[in-house]
Amino acid sequence: MAPSTVAVELLSPKEKNRLRKPVVEKMRRDRINSSIEQLKLLLEQEFARHQPNSKLEKADILEMAVSYLKHSKAFVAAAGPKSLHQDYSEGYSWCLQEAVQFLTLHAASDTQMKLLYHFQRPPAAPAAPAKEPKAPGAAPPPALSAKATAAAAAAHQPACGLWRPW
């Protein structure tokens, strides 16, 4: 039996807190140092541009991170707020590109062709709040590859609709 285990069990709560405090403080400092090191790695190019051959102190790293975040925030604000429709269109386009890329990687099947044909149609716009003006038209989906377009057109059968579980 280790003597330190017995000694800790016999200590009062106040004495346990006194012993635990330096350990907790060291863990806190380690977390801070780790986070500062991660910031340094993330902003490495920014540091090289502003201070090429200097040893960076923790304060320098934090100042540079704050400066970078302020600049990023100002850049986003200058770009202007996005509308709900714009967000929806961008998300739809990204999802469409991912789905088409996945579908064209595998051997063609009837269901795959129907999906590709379905993706050719423009997306339905989301319901916009009353205070936000609606865009005049939905952004068309990005052009599909020639292979996907040809396969979708060949597989389309007007008499048979696409099955949906809803």
UniProtKB/Swiss-Prot annotation:
- Give a GO molecular function annotation for the protein: protein dimerization activity
Region entry Disordered, spans: 125-144
**Cellular location of this protein?**
Nucleus
* Tissue distribution of the protein: Expressed in fetal heart and brain tumors.
Q: Which residues form the bHLH domain?
A: 16-72
Annotated GO CC locations = chromatin; nucleoplasm; nucleus
**Annotated domain remarks:** Has a particular type of basic domain (presence of a helix-interrupting proline) that binds to the N-box (CACNAG), rather than the canonical E-box (CANNTG). The C-terminal WRPW motif is a transcriptional repression domain necessary for the interaction with Groucho/TLE family members, transcriptional corepressors recruited to specific target DNA by Hairy-related proteins.
Give the multimer and partner information.
Transcription repression requires formation of a complex with a corepressor protein of the Groucho/TLE family.
Protein name (Swiss-Prot/TrEMBL): Transcription factor HES-5
Origin species: Homo sapiens (Human)
Source organism phylogeny? Eukaryota, Metazoa, Chordata, Craniata, Vertebrata
